[in-house]
Amino acid sequence: MDMLHLSARPDARTVVTYHSDIVKQKRLMKLYQPLQERFLASVDCIVASSPNYVASSQTLKKYQDKTVVIPFGLEQHDVQHDPQRVAHWRETVGDNFFLFVGAFRYYKGLHILLDAAERSRLPVVIVGGGPLEAEVRREAQQRGLSNVVFTGMLNDEDKYILFQLCRGVVFPSHLRSEAFGITLLEGARFARPLISCEIGTGTSFINQDKVSGCVIPPNDSQALVEAMNELWNNEETSNRYGENSRRRFEEMFTADHMIDAYVNLYTTLLESKS
């Protein structure tokens, strides 16, 4: 896209959404960086999903005068679920557990979650699949983690039922490759307390420490255990965090908020062109 844009030189306002720095492919970044800088310098506006990412990104620091923040948003969820499906999941996993939803990738911190599950013995349900699935399942089996349940990939209805049944959402991503954290938004939509790591990205924009949940140091399984115990042993605190996460979702992270922000941005750019 960037090469096409630079070669075409369109006579139109240009907006690019910047989701993530190049984190893992550092050698590739050295080759790509000159092209990236030319491309970002040429556009009229860069959209980032959180002020946290703008502040921590070495790339975006060069373009703060043209960068705006528009968070990702989700639709409100007021659907009544099939009682039989709810009963199935309540029988399968109960209605008081910590929920992880996501791809099994190197930056998701699943090894940290398994370590915390072993130390705390608290119930954990893991939803998803991906490149590391076999490895993660094997590790859980070798550790004898009978308190950890793997569901595999689920459709939206089953996933949303688990959000409603869980005690809290755990999101132990420990690397900046996790640029935002849609799972945290989904948890907030269902008024769940959240646990995430401070990695300088949108995860700490969605989840505020001691407001909507717990923000812990990355790659620290003991800190994760302590956060899980806080939510498990203090129902009043857990409920307050959940109410706050839902309120924050309604105030900042709905699809309507996102759409309105983009409409306002496009309108402003078009008016400035004319």
Where are these regions (language model features)?
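An aromatic- and histidine-rich active-site surface loop
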Residues: 1-11
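Donor nucleotide-sugar binding/catalytic pocket of nucleotide-sugar-dependent glycosyltransferases
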Residues: 36-82, 93-95, 150-151
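A conserved mid-protein helix/loop that constitutes part of the nucleotide-sugar donor-binding site
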Residues: 96-119, 131-137, 222
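Acidic donor-binding loop of glycosyltransferase active sites
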Residues: 98, 164-179, 192
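Nucleotide-activated donor-binding/catalytic signature segment of Leloir-type glycosyltransferases, i.e.
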Residues: 122, 137-157
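Short hydrophobic beta-strand element within catalytic cores of glycosyltransferases
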Residues: 170, 189, 193-197, 207
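Conserved acidic donor-binding segment of nucleotide-sugar-dependent glycosyltransferases
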Residues: 208-221, 228-236
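A short, well-ordered alpha-helix in the C-terminal region of glycosyltransferases
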Residues: 223, 230, 237-252, 258-264, ...
